[in-house]
């Protein structure tokens, strides 16, 4: 859907980062009914990568601290060396190097910062990652690299992405199923191939025409 259609709001609501009504079912549990303590185990399994690779990383923290923050919260029983090993594994997974661990976000390009954000999500071995326009702030060539990385990681760990985007070319490269939103409502949903080849809603047809004309 276009900007303002409710995509990001829906993603944040699913993660219970904003108040919402309705039901959110994960592993046979309705997250809406859970108190903070009962919700904590699910927080580990439900991660997010934000759109802005510049604003979503604390400028006062090193890469090691940023990527390892979730481990300190969700796996406090880990020793320092175990935590460091998991952080190293995560940053190598996303194509960064060990010597980058003690550097700060301002020392990196946009694409590298987004890789740090992805490593921060991956280090907890989540089941679902909400990807909130993770490539929209990047140059086209860097976008392609991040899309390739996301596909590779998804296959390796059998991850589910809720990939939020208005860029249908990126959606086509990644999505198995698509939900089209307009003004806060779902207007069409189905398998990606079906949506791209035989859209039924006029709004979906307009989006596809604009993206691929």
Positions of PLM-derived features:
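ABC ATPase "signature
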Residues: 189-190, 198
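Conserved ABC ATPase signature
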Residues: 104-108, 112
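Conserved catalytic motifs of ABC-family nucleotide-binding domains
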Residues: 125
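A short, surface-exposed alpha-helical micro-motif characterized by mixed small hydrophobic
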Residues: 171-173
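Conserved ABC ATPase "signature" region
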Residues: 30, 81-99, 208-209
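Conserved ABC transporter NBD signature motif
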Residues: 22-31
